[in-house]
């Protein structure tokens, strides 16, 4: 637990940049405030680990106050860092947390309360360790554990996870260059390019400060949120901007933003679509972002495979501001369409889909391996939204895969719910489509029914090479997954299965989803999945190389083959999580 808390502090304490500080004095007081908040975060974590009981200070067994270099009993640990932040010969920050002002001792967890008082300090030094001046700030936080815990939404990009917690956005995982990519990304949105296996708060800008966070998506190396303030909705994006996927009018090799930037609305006659609260949904895939505004679909970013749904693949190559996708023509979106939902997933794919009010699905973009579901493959992609073949009464759709790099394409696929049943198409070689497929590589070019799923499908989510569905089986909600399981993506607690064409039940019980709670919703992406339960706690499984699971561990040796509670995803009203 101590290692986890140290990591938690590292994620909690991110120095704000000078551009947001009006004077040096304000800067140091701001740092003192943040150091104090890091102390309240530490106290929260210690309370969590000790059943809401104070373990430091003057209580039995307590050694002293909480400081960065102490454990939860207040005892100094030589292996811990002495300061929250140490800027060498300039300044350093620390905190001290004393006894709780309202004790939680002998109080039921469902009603426990505490007043945490933390003193944050900034010590200005002369380069030799001598303190020249000290700035202090006292931070007091009321902490509660009510029975009704706030709901949360999680999304998974490539090697990172993001969540909406108490109307703030938090991300964790990779935040810089990855593998062969030569460009810095900043996809955690906290103003740095430092990766973190604990949540860091995405910088709140514009209407993110005072408005409501309505929606979020995480694509390959960028993310976006939809906000509403004073009945006006806006979109903010951060991360990689090589192809204009942030929508702020800028793009180019090496372009990125480590803090959210506002998406520029279209101009001219189309500007009205983005006015007021007309934006109803956002979504993204690979290096493209999309939104539904006034019932119409707009996209911005890369168009190499037609994923803008505008013009021909590669013409234009990209757009740094929203463009309305094409409509009209045989088997395409009708001119008078009204969109209701964008496809989820898509951390690495070059395909997008939309559901209309007629409950029909239309897809566009990369089509080489049948992932559009239109009955024919097409190497160069489709720049027009085309109807998915033979599906009626479509209520949900999700897509993901590897086509951003061109290989391995056989893992690219799409799944949808039609009339309560799950259908999948596209790449099928690892079982992700629920049946083997044909050709080389194995694929389905039109929807195929996934067998072995009991009851009525409520939600479908896909990752790079696996799929999951939430089923209502005679009144009981159950999660099933199929496809690649080498990293634990199926959550079935089965290390003996590498690939499965047959849906496997996600593990339920002491080492899985709690049997006493209902599954409320799913989220998936890349090589993992998550389920939100009726007690509003989240459980995730699969790849954990960058700490994406959220249980305080990281590294491929900590991949989870069974659902594991994501402690970071336990927001509570009036409770601060860092």
What is the role of each PLM region?
Residues 142-578:
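Eukaryote-biased RCC1-like beta-propeller repeat architecture
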Residues 1-145, 572-578:
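Beta-strand/loop motifs with alternating small/hydrophobic and polar/acidic residues, enriched
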